[in-house]
Design a protein with these regions (language model features):
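Active-site loop/oxyanion-hole signature of alpha/beta-hydrolase fold enzymes
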Residues: 46, 55-95, 256
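Gly/Ala-rich beta-loop-alpha elbow adjacent to hydrolase catalytic centers
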Residues: 96, 100, 104
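Alpha/beta-hydrolase fold catalytic core
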Residues: 1-29, 51-52, 89-90, 159, ...
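Conserved alpha/beta-hydrolase catalytic His-Asp/Glu region
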Residues: 129-131, 147-203
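Catalytic active-site module of serine/aspartate enzymes centered on a nucleophile-bearing elbow/loop
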Residues: 233-267
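Conserved loop-alpha-helix segment in the C-terminal half of the alpha/beta-hydrolase fold
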Residues: 208-242, 248
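Flexible "cap/lid" loop of the alpha/beta hydrolase fold
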Residues: 105, 109, 116-146
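Conserved HGGG/HGGXW glycine-rich cap/lid loop of the alpha/beta-hydrolase fold
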Residues: 11-66
Length: 267
């Protein structure tokens, strides 16, 4: 994988891409969740890069892509497209975990022609009807609520909430370690509040795969996905013994499900 940097007035965005882009192969863009980094997909990169063009990044305001001024999902969606154009990729399968699914839907909202397919991993849908007033209030006030936790307790709570295995817990905890408490709390605020601002009723016309950990107890993720599944007539694929970071908890299951999906859309 080659490390590259997308440079902009808002900040530098670090990403990693296959050494050679093969025009005949599908391109996969892996989009990690809030407060994580490209390390979330450590168990996907090696599995997929032999057959596909693979891109992973540290999303704007995350990991190595800091500082980043004026985070918004519109900006981030544009950054995704700039990376594709920079590497002469006409379209990609967007694979988004949690916040990464919001980014994918933000791209679909603005640039549907660049999205070959969408894989949602423990994410939730765009759409006004899914979120109650209390849901929106909580998401808009997450910064203040998270500041009530002592620093170390906050990191442990986030890592524990998101995972159901020792290796995934340790990976999540390490990804959180690059932020001080104020930055971590603010990042959660802009991630969730930004989603509420960008949220809209969205029709997704590309092939879609919904993956959800059976033990995902983050917010109402399972409830939202059941409603989403019914709305778009796409069944949920439940990942056994996995929490919110299901691709890290159970990489073999998730990789197999994604591979079967990719083979289906390539036919």
């Amino acid at each position: 994988m080659l490390e590259k940097i997308l440079r902009s007035e808002s900040g530098n965005v670090h990403y990693w891409i296959s050494n050679t882009i093969r025009k005949e192969s599908l391109s996969l863009f892996f989009l990690h969740g809030l407060t994580a980094s490209h390390d979330l997909f450590v168990n996907q990169i090696g599995y997929f890069e032999k057959d596909y063009n693979v891109i992973v990044w540290d999303a704007p305001a995350h990991g190595m892509s800091r500082p980043y001024r004026g985070f918004s999902y519109e900006k981030v969606a544009n950054d995704v497209i700039k990376i594709l154009k920079e590497n002469k990729i006409d379209s990609a399968v967007l694979i988004g975990q949690s916040m990464g699914g919001y980014i994918a839907q933000s791209v679909i909202k603005r640039f549907p022609e660049y999205v070959k397919a969408f894989v949602s991993i423990d994410s939730t849908p765009f759409g006004e009807k899914y979120y109650s007033k209390i849901d929106r209030w909580i998401l808009k006030h997450i910064e203040g609520m998270s500041k009530l936790y002592p620093d170390k307790s906050l990191r442990k709570a986030i890592a524990k909430q998101n995972t159901n295995s020792k290796h995934a817990y340790e990976n999540m905890y390490n990804m959180l370690s690059v932020y001080d408490k104020d930055e971590l709390c603010h990042l959660m605020a802009i991630g969730y509040a930004g989603f509420m601002e960008d949220n809209c009723n969205l029709q997704i016309n590309c092939p879609t795969l919904l993956l959800v950990g059976e033990k995902d107890n983050t917010g109402k993720v399972r409830q939202y996905n059941k409603a989403w599944s019914n709305e778009i007539n796409v069944p949920i694929t439940w990942i056994r013994d996995a929490a919110h970071n299901s691709n890290d908890d159970q990489p073999e299951q998730v990789n197999r499900c994604i591979k079967e999906f990719l083979l289906g859309i390539a036919e």
